[in-house]
């Protein structure tokens, strides 16, 4: 078993949406509760910055060196690190007050994929039970949002194979990682199938390495697993 070492003790309540920026060699993520805070750390000089956000933000995606896309409970937003300006790009489910956003990521063409779910937090940040699969999987492209999947519990894991032929996704409430065929040019999914099951915890967020192995965090399992897609 591999050894895990603490990199930075930032004392997040619920860290989500970690994203790597190759532009400036930095890691970005959000602590989503009780009030969302954006973190950015440069791995060259280990400078850590924090930014208070006016919205309940759960996922991040790089736009440019100075801008980042942020998925929030009722839309997608843009944040500028220099001006500190936070602005709405597009509304999503702003008429469904009982839902919130969850995980998300961008594909190789820059489309932003993200999921929504029933809000499982009270206003003070305390947890409340889920009792509905009211979430959906969305794709934002050319300032238009398309619904890809519905009736989701907790959408997690947004990763693509190195050759962009596969998309891996999970509904944590279902317990399985899913694999889709992915058409990069069209931004479309097909041939959904169960890909991976594990008896320790449930699938949460994931990333993929250069060899195509998927690293999946296990909610309730206190572990990370590395999965060979073959």
Q: What is each of the regions a protein language model found here?
A:
Residues 3-9, 46-52, 87-94, 144-150, ...:
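A short beta-strand motif characteristic of beta-propeller blades
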Residues 10-24, 54-69, 95-111, 118, ...:
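Beta-rich, blade/repeat-based domains predominating
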Residues 21-22, 27-33, 69-74, 114-121, ...:
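Conserved beta-strand positions in repeat-built beta-propeller and related beta-rich domains
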Residues 27-51, 73-76:
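Beta-propeller domains
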Residues 37-39, 75-77, 135-138, 176-178, ...:
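A short loop-to-beta-strand structural motif that recurs across blades of beta-propeller domains
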Residues 130-142:
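Beta-propeller blade signature
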Residues 175-176, 196-230:
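Loop/turn-rich, solvent-exposed surfaces of beta-rich toroidal or solenoidal domains
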Residues 180-187:
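Short loop/turn segments immediately following beta-strands, especially the blade-tip
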């Amino acid at each position: 078993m591999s050894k895990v070492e603490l990199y930075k003790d930032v004392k997040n309540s619920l860290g989500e949406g970690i994203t790597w920026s190759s532009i400036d060699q930095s890691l970005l993520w959000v602590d989503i509760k009780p009030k969302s805070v954006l973190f950015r750390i440069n791995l060259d000089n280990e400078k850590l910055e924090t930014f208070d956000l006016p919205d309940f933000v759960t996922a991040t995606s790089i736009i440019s060196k100075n801008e980042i896309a942020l998925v929030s409970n009722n839309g997608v937003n843009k944040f500028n690190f220099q001006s500190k300006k936070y602005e709405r790009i597009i509304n999503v489910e702003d008429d469904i007050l009982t839902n919130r956003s969850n995980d998300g990521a961008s594909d190789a063409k820059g489309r932003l994929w993200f999921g929504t779910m029933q809000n499982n937090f009270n206003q003070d940040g305390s947890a409340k039970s889920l009792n509905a699969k009211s979430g959906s999987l969305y794709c934002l492209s050319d300032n238009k949002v398309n619904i890809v999947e519905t009736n989701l519990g907790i959408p997690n894991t947004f990763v693509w194979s190195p050759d962009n032929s596969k998309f891996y996704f999970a509904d944590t409430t279902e317990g399985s990682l899913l694999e889709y065929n992915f058409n990069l040019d069209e931004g479309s999914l097909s041939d959904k199938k169960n890909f991976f099951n594990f008896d320790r915890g449930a699938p949460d967020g994931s990333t993929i390495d250069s060899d195509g192995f998927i690293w999946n965090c296990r909610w309730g399992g206190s572990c990370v697993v590395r999965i060979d897609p073959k």
